[in-house]
């Protein structure tokens, strides 16, 4: 009788362990980094629903969300300011959360930066090179802090950011991502659909554009 009880208890413990492991591996902690694309900046200078928010919704439907941190992103973020945030272990005052800790604990990290920094009429080759140099450092640091899923969005051409410039920049970014085993998600085709933008005067997508970006990320990572 005692043997049966012991076996029953061991079986229950083992089953609980299996169930715990299944649910544990399904839990997701998302950290979003970047500029106005990451925050959901709109033509009306207000923050809307971003692709990160749509990703959060996607994970809520398919997995369990532990945490979603989007406050590290800033609509005027540049590669330089993001790099310094990482190096200086920037702290969110609202929650007293350190960025390195948040990144270390994250299971899914997204980065979208470069549109605010590079899309202006006096863009120089030096600025592009500085951007790529900073992105190299950022990507390297992220891999130091985290060994799980990291997604970097491509740039796309718009007004001052010419198609050929974007192509060269994206090729460099893609190579950096390949070296560090990071997902590089190409969203350059977003500019081929006017329905994805508020109007022709803004580089920021509307909610349809952000849904498109979310879908491209899901396809790249999970398909």
Question: How would you name each of these model-derived features?
Answer:
Residues 1-33, 37-46, 56-67, 100-104, ...:
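N-terminal secretory targeting modules
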Residues 29-31, 39-125:
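Conserved SGNH/GDSL esterase-like catalytic core that processes O-acyl groups on lipids
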Residues 40-45, 122-129, 159-162, 198-204:
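Second-shell loop/turn segments in exported
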Residues 68-70, 149, 181-183:
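Conserved beta-strand segments of alpha/beta enzyme cores
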Residues 71-73, 154, 186-188:
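Residue-level recognition of beta-strand->loop/alpha-helix junctions
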Residues 110-119, 139-169:
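Active-site segments of SGNH/GDSL-like serine hydrolases
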Residues 127-136, 165-170:
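Charged helix-capping and loop-helix junction motifs
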Residues 157-223:
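Catalytic His-Asp segment of secreted/periplasmic serine-dependent ester chemistry enzymes
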